[in-house]
Amino acid sequence: MISVGQQIIFISSGAALGALSRWGLGLLLNPLFSAFSLGTLVANYLGCLIIGVFLAFFWQYPQCSAEWRLFFVTGFLGSLTTFSTFSAEVIENLIQQKWLAGLMLASGHLLGCLLFTALGVFIWRYWQ
């Protein structure tokens, strides 16, 4: 078992790369469509694709070290996009045939995120 300090280093290292990747995608792709945040969409889609690959890999090779999981999944993908983690949790429930849990999780995240985003906009406008 690795220490908490080592875990923090693995997560932080991955997170730095994920954040820089997301920022770079925004710089590269957002100017292509001024009314649409293409960099964010690509970051979310790419993060979901990558987390799917890593989940399948870790399922097949459960002996893979916790350090790699912390670096890639928690750090890099968590920083690149939180949508990938949400997608992984829903898919894990569905693969395990926990249909209701998967549906509730998907609905809760989607509706909750939309509602909290709207609430944030409302709060900002109210306090202006």
Swiss-Prot record:
Record comment: activity regulation: Na(+) is not transported, but it plays an essential structural role and its presence is essential for fluoride channel function.
Disulphide linkage map: none
Binding residues for Na(+): G78, T81
GO molecular function, one term: metal ion binding
Keyword Nucleus: no
TM region(s), chain numbering: 8-28, 38-58, 71-91, 103-123
UniProt keyword annotation of Zinc present: no
Protein name: Fluoride-specific ion channel FluC
